[in-house]
Structure formats: structure tokens, C-alpha cells
Swiss-Prot record:
<dbReference type="GO" id="GO:0005737">
    <property type="term" value="C:cytoplasm"/>
</dbReference>
<keyword id="KW-0687">Ribonucleoprotein</keyword>
<protein>
    <recommendedName>
        <fullName>Small ribosomal subunit protein bS16</fullName>
    </recommendedName>
</protein>
<dbReference type="GO" id="GO:0003735">
    <property type="term" value="F:structural constituent of ribosome"/>
</dbReference>
<dbReference type="InterPro" id="IPR000307">
    <property type="entry name" value="Ribosomal_bS16"/>
</dbReference>
<dbReference type="GO" id="GO:0015935">
    <property type="term" value="C:small ribosomal subunit"/>
</dbReference>
<dbReference type="GO" id="GO:0006412">
    <property type="term" value="P:translation"/>
</dbReference>
<dbReference type="Pfam" id="PF00886">
    <property type="entry name" value="Ribosomal_S16"/>
</dbReference>
<comment type="similarity">
    <text>Belongs to the bacterial ribosomal protein bS16 family.</text>
</comment>
<keyword id="KW-0689">Ribosomal protein</keyword>
<dbReference type="InterPro" id="IPR023803">
    <property type="entry name" value="Ribosomal_bS16_dom_sf"/>
</dbReference>
Length: 83
């Protein structure tokens, strides 16, 4: 099954996540089909906290990709910010 989920990056104590489209059987930070955005939970000041390519996210959702719980929240938040 194709899923949209977060892949962790960054360094110790400073998480940074990429929103990735991947096969659900692949490791969390492993192989992916496409990166469609990023999420920086500890962004401060003028740093961008969330960036999502809405067109690609809509495409993958229309193709049957299942977002994780957290990604579903982030997509909703990004759609609200874009409107």
C-alpha cells in the first residue's frame, strides 16, 4: 500500500521531517517514491514550519495513497494556511 508519511532527518535533539510518498513496507527513513514537502516542528522566527506541494499531495491522495495520522493533520493545516 502506498502511504504518505514523515521521514525523520535533522540531528540529535533537532528533528526535521520530510513528507514522503512511499510503500508502507519500506523503512521509515528508507526508499521513497517522492518527497512532497517538509515539516520543521521547532521552527522559530522567520523559519518556515510547514511546506507542502498541494498539487502533488492531492494527486497521490486521488491515486489511493493513505496519509498517516500526523500527515493528515499537517495536510489539513497546510490547506487552511494556503486558503
Amino acid at each position: 500500500m502506498v502511504t504518505i508519511r514523515l521521514a525523520r532527518g535533522g540531528s540529535k535533539k533537532r528533528p526535521f521531517y520530510h513528507l514522503t510518498v512511499t510503500n508502507s513496507r519500506n523503512p521509515r527513513d528508507g526508499r521513497f517514491v517522492e518527497r512532497i514537502g517538509f515539516f520543521n516542528p521547532i521552527a522559530t522566527g522567520a523559519e518556515v514550519k510547514l511546506s507542502v506541494n498541494q498539487e502533488r499531495a492531492a494527486y497521490w491522495l486521488s491515486q489511493g495513497a493513505q496519509p498517516s495520522e500526523r500527515v493528515a493533520q499537517l495536510l489539513k493545516e497546510a490547506a487552511k494556511a494556503a486558503a
